[in-house]
Regions:
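Outer-membrane beta-barrel transmembrane domain signature
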Residues: 100-206, 237
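Short sequence motifs at beta-strands and strand-loop junctions characteristic
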Residues: 7-12, 83-90, 103, 159-168, ...
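Outer-membrane beta-barrel "beta-signal"
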Residues: 223-237
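Glycine- and aromatic-enriched membrane insertion/assembly motifs of diderm outer-membrane
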Residues: 5-73
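Extracytoplasmic loops and strand-loop junctions of Gram-negative outer membrane beta-barrel proteins
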Residues: 1-3, 74-82, 150-159, 212-218
């Protein structure tokens, strides 16, 4: 069984500048700097997750997470978390080895592989939730709106929930079309696999708790090892 599962796929975007250092006609090193937005989802509780525990958090009046110490929820608005959609911005530095064919007509084809180092600049989440009230006398929950439905809270600051750095393996292929002289347009497709957990350590996420037994709440140890497929195009000169 599963405790967590992949949520909805996200469509991100980015832009940047690259530098190529040519070793010879067919081999070069590509690096530079680019900005990107990564989007992905994680399911914390649904009928398909047979091992899932109910997960809770509390927000203050400014919709910031409130740290949860002890077994009773802290003061604030209490919610059960069902699904979380991440929107994380990064500054990325690629280090890529690029292997090119000789020019065929006006086209040069290439494959490339290497790594990308990303530094987080901002993280937001959209949470699918249910508002709750908690009765300390019998450790029970009740729906605070008397409605059996889920709601959304958008753009909650999630810097404490996500790692500051990500490391990705990069594999791609593409083509360059020569316009004139040293000026070409290019398009390429890359697959990135990020080797470290997107989410922070449980002790750093002190505001998120799962109920392991009635009235007993422990830290959530969710893991998300994401990847993405990137379609790029631009101008070389």
């Amino acid at each position: 069984g599963k405790k967590y599962s992949q949520g909805p796929l996200g469509l991100g975007f980015g832009w940047g500048f690259d530098i190529e250092i040519n070793f010879n006609t067919n081999t070069s090193l590509r690096t530079g700097i680019n900005l990107s937005t990564f989007k992905a989802g994680l399911n914390y509780y649904n009928s398909d997750l047979t091992l899932a525990k109910e997960t809770y958090f509390v927000l203050d009046a400014s919709e910031n997470y409130v740290n949860w110490d002890g077994n009773n929820p802290p003061d604030g608005d209490l919610y059960q978390l069902y699904n979380r959609k991440f929107k994380v911005n990064y500054v990325n530095i690629p280090v890529i080895l690029k292997l090119k064919t000789n020019e065929i007509g006006y086209f040069t084809y290439y494959g490339e592989f290497g790594a990308t180092l990303g530094f987080k600049t901002k993280a937001l989440v959209d949470d699918e939730i249910k508002p709750l009230d908690y009765n300390q006398s019998d450790s029970s929950f009740s729906n605070s709106l008397n409605l059996n439905q889920k709601l959304y809270i958008l753009d909650i600051n999630a810097d404490k929930s996500t790692q500051p750095i990500r490391i990705g393996l990069n594999l791609g292929a593409g083509a360059e079309y020569n316009l004139s002289g040293n000026t070409s347009i290019f398009f390429q497709l890359n697959w990135n696999y990020f080797v470290n957990n997107l989410l922070t350590r449980p002790e750093n996420e002190a505001f998120l708790r799962e109920e392991t037994s009635k009235g007993i709440f422990n830290a959530v140890d969710a893991k998300a090892i994401p990847g993405n497929i990137v379609l790029s195009f631009g101008v070389l000169f």
